[in-house]
């Protein structure tokens, strides 16, 4: 049992690393998706000349961006350059979009050039640094590109074909709705970005390149299950949960920040049944309508889903979202109405969260003894950190930034991903399930755990403390 918290943290870290290669490049993916939806022969405005952008973007641009980002995550720009060059080997050596290959070669290139520098730099004489740095990177990049072209590329192609065939078998057997049994609980455990951008998106993009769309883009991004739970809290919830549910529903459905409904599930874990049932019914509807998207919608907003929907196929996408919402709402309403408890404090919710995760909560002690944690004496920078650094943390930072401004304090409030936490931050605010990872990344800062980024009493407590 003692090893499980570290194992969960490792899974989250690995998933965050995979999604970290995709998330910074989402704008490029959306650009490709829009060009595809607009200008291919079945698009809104078919244009043979502009449609020529589709192939090169998915074959070269997107994999190279992933490879560069993966290398940069390991060893800054130098790692990114070698990672991109290494990625070119798998791109040219394959006849399918090489996203999985890019996610391998990019970090590998960054890791190897980092090790090469560690060996060579202490031995380089003064005046030869630029020569050695440039040629060591160039030689290694050339070797990796050749190895990727001849060896790694064919292996990744075979692996991708096996994955694609497996997905086709699952879809053909009508088993795809069962994926929600795994996806929905994993989302609540903050693996949503890892699932969507690390697993489903690479396979889905391969499908979209050949078939023009992929249903895999809809599995994790469907806002229906979470919306149903939030609507149930709006009608049958109690206390703070009911008061905050309307705002959370708007942010979730329109803004696409799915993390906003996770605390509601963690407060009453039996609601996981509602989102699983909603997810399964939504996927079943997508299968019935043969629905799919041309590219990954990010964030998972209803507007992003509609923007990535092929022309003439809105009915299937909307039907899947609506049915998922209704099913999730009905089941969540039954659970809330039949629940004896009227409210839960944070300690009780944490204990129930242990049952949902099947392990002792690694943050329970931190939650109970939060007041005993060392506090920063001089505060100049406060960082909100989440898994991707773009969704829930941005929302929390905006709320606290407004409070700090109204209090007349000259303190920087920003947001980032846990993997990108700077060293000069004074206070780090994270969701309680991610605090351990943040402490491991930056153990010297003051860490504050919150249960809900949208509404936490700790914001006012912190502002009052900083004013005094």
Curated annotation (Swiss-Prot):
Primary site of residence: membrane
Class in the EC hierarchy, top level: transferase
TM stretches of this protein: 26-47, 52-72, 136-157, 167-187, 275-294, 315-336
Gene Ontology MF term list: kinase activity; protein-N(PI)-phosphohistidine-mannitol phosphotransferase system transmembrane transporter activity; protein-phosphocysteine-sugar phosphotransferase activity
GO BP annotations listed: phosphoenolpyruvate-dependent sugar phosphotransferase system
Extracellular face residues: 48-51, 158-166, 295-314
Location in the cell: Cell membrane
Catalysis performed (reactions): D-mannitol(out) + N(pros)-phospho-L-histidyl-[protein] = D-mannitol 1-phosphate(in) + L-histidyl-[protein]
Gene Ontology terms: cellular component: plasma membrane
Superkingdom of the organism of origin: Bacteria
Topological relation to the membrane, as annotated: Multi-pass membrane protein
Boundaries of every PTS EIIB type-2 domain copy: 380-468
Residues annotated with Phosphocysteine modification: 386
Cytoplasmic domain ranges by topology: 1-25, 73-135, 188-274, 337-468
Keywords: Cell membrane, Kinase, Membrane, Phosphoprotein, Phosphotransferase system, Sugar transport, Transferase, Transmembrane, Transmembrane helix, Transport
Pfam families: PTS_EIIC (PF02378), PTS_IIB (PF02302)
Residue ranges occupied by any PTS EIIC type-2 domain in the UniProt entry: 14-344
List of catalytic residues: 386 (phosphocysteine intermediate)
EC number: 2.7.1.197
Domain note: The EIIC type-2 domain forms the PTS system translocation channel and contains the specific substrate-binding site. The PTS EIIB type-2 domain is phosphorylated by phospho-EIIA on a cysteinyl residue. Then, it transfers the phosphoryl group to the sugar substrate concomitantly with the sugar uptake processed by the PTS EIIC type-2 domain.
Subunit structure: Homodimer.
Function: The phosphoenolpyruvate-dependent sugar phosphotransferase system (sugar PTS), a major carbohydrate active transport system, catalyzes the phosphorylation of incoming sugar substrates concomitantly with their translocation across the cell membrane. The enzyme II CmtAB PTS system is involved in D-mannitol transport.
Protein name as annotated: PTS system mannitol-specific EIICB component
Gene source species: Halalkalibacterium halodurans (strain ATCC BAA-125 / DSM 18197 / FERM 7344 / JCM 9153 / C-125)
């Amino acid at each position: 049992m003692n090893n499980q918290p570290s194992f969960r943290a490792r899974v989250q870290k690995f998933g965050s690393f995979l999604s970290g290669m995709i998330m910074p490049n989402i704008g490029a993916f959306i650009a490709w998706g829009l060009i595809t939806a607009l200008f291919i022969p079945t698009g809104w405005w078919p244009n043979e000349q502009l449609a020529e952008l589709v192939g090169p973007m998915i074959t070269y641009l997107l994999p190279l961006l992933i490879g560069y980002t993966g290398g940069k995550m390991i060893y800054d720009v130098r790692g990114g350059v070698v990672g991109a060059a290494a990625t070119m080997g798998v791109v040219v050596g394959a006849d399918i979009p090489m996203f999985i290959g890019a996610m391998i070669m990019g970090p590998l290139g960054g890791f190897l050039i980092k090790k090469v520098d560690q060996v060579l730099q202490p031995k380089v004489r003064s005046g030869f640094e630029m020569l050695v740095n440039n040629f060591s990177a160039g030689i290694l990049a050339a070797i990796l590109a050749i190895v990727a072209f001849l060896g790694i590329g064919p292996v990744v192609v075979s692996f991708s074909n096996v994955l694609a065939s497996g997905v086709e078998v699952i879809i053909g057997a009508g088993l795809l709705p069962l994926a929600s049994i795994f996806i929905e609980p994993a989302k609540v455990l903050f693996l949503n970005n890892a699932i969507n951008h690390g697993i489903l998106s690479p396979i889905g993009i391969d499908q979209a390149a050949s078939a023009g769309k992929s249903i895999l883009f809809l599995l994790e991004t469907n806002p229906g299950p979470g919306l149903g739970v939030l609507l149930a809290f709006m009608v049958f919830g109690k206390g703070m949960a009911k008061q905050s549910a309307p705002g959370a529903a708007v942010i979730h459905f329109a803004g696409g920040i799915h993390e906003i409904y996770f605390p509601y599930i963690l407060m009453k874990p039996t609601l996981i049944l509602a989102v699983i049932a909603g997810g399964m019914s939504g996927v079943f509807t997508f299968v019935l309508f043969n629905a799919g998207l041309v590219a990954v919608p990010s964030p998972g907003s209803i507007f992003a889903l509609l923007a990535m929907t092929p022309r003439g196929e809105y009915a299937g996408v909307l039907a899947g979202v609506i049915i998922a919402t209704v099913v999730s709402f009905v089941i969540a309403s039954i659970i809330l109405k039949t629940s004896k408890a009227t409210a839960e404090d944070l300690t009780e919710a944490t204990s129930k969260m242990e049952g949902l995760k099947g392990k002792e909560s690694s943050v329970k002690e931190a939650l109970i003894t939060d007041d005993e944690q060392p506090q920063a004496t001089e505060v100049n920078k406060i960082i909100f950190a989440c898994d991707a650094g773009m969704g829930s943390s941005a929302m929390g930072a905006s709320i606290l930034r407004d409070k700090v401004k109204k209090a007349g304090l000259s303190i920087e409030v920003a947001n980032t991903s846990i993997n990108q936490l700077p060293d000069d931050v004074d206070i780090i605010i994270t969701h309680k399930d991610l605090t351990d990872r943040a402490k491991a990344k930056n153990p010297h800062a003051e860490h504050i755990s919150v249960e809900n980024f949208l509404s936490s009493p700790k914001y006012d407590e912190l502002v009052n403390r900083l004013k005094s």
